[in-house]
Amino acid sequence: MGRLRSAAMGALPVFRIELGGQAGHSELHTSLSKNLYPMARLYHVPLSPFCRKVRLVLAEKKIDVELIEERYWEADPDFLRRNPAGKVPILKMNGRTMPDSMAICEYLEEKNPTPPLMPQSAEGRYEVRRLVAWFDDKFHQEVTSKLLYERVNKKLMNQGYPDSRNVKEGAKAIKYHLDYMAWLLDHRRWLAGDSMSIADFAAASHLSALDYNSDVDWTRSDTVKDWYAKIKSRPAFRSILADQVPGFPPAKHYNDLDF
């Protein structure tokens, strides 16, 4: 797909996927024509699981995207004009500005259904949406917000030190969620059924963000570990594994496909 290069845009890093040479330009033109997309622009935060979910869908569907890191907590007026809710991700595409990670993912699925990341049946789509809500609501509230927010976000936002009680609660809660994932994967090939879906990307987005700080006990379930290894080894995951947050080096195994 080319290489990911960082460029400057004000104080924010910008990442562009570039293809070199005449053949590269031809490949880019063919890719854009095939997918009917101009260059998309995604405002994101590297360790945000909601942003990662959108990034994975974009990459899996081979949609070229410009990544712009947005320090949303600074409430920049230009950013708030794009999304008054003050949240990321925000996708700019086809003249539209679109917030909300799941709404973005479903938009991308409907506009570019190959490869499919939602089942054909109403029951299958329901199950994908149920599990995405499970991870983006319940898992996020009980685990991600108590580990990632306390250990990383607080420092980035200058909001003080981690609350040890929240960290302990998150470390305890993740065990239950890993067990639930193991149960699902004992009965299914992927989390929502026989095919990989947005539900798998939602779960992997949260776990990868936590794994950056080594907050996932992969010895708890070989089933979950094997599932994550499959997701982690996909080309769509490469930019996720390349993420770096200043002041927070990733765990040594974070980008190791064999971890």
What positions do the PLM features span?
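Short, hydrophobic secondary-structure boundary micro-motifs
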Residues: 115-120, 142-143, 191-194, 219, ...
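Extreme N-terminal basic, low-complexity initiation segments
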Residues: 1-14
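GST-like fold's C-terminal all-alpha helical module
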Residues: 135-233
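Acidic/histidine-enriched, glycine/proline-rich intrinsically disordered or flexible terminal extensions
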Residues: 244-259
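Phosphate-coordinating loops and pocket residues in cytosolic domains that bind phosphorylated ligands
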Residues: 81, 233, 242
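Short Gly/Ser/Thr- and charged-rich N-terminal loops/segments
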Residues: 5-7, 20-24, 33
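GST-like domain detector, emphasizing the conserved glutathione-binding G-site
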Residues: 16, 27-168, 182, 258
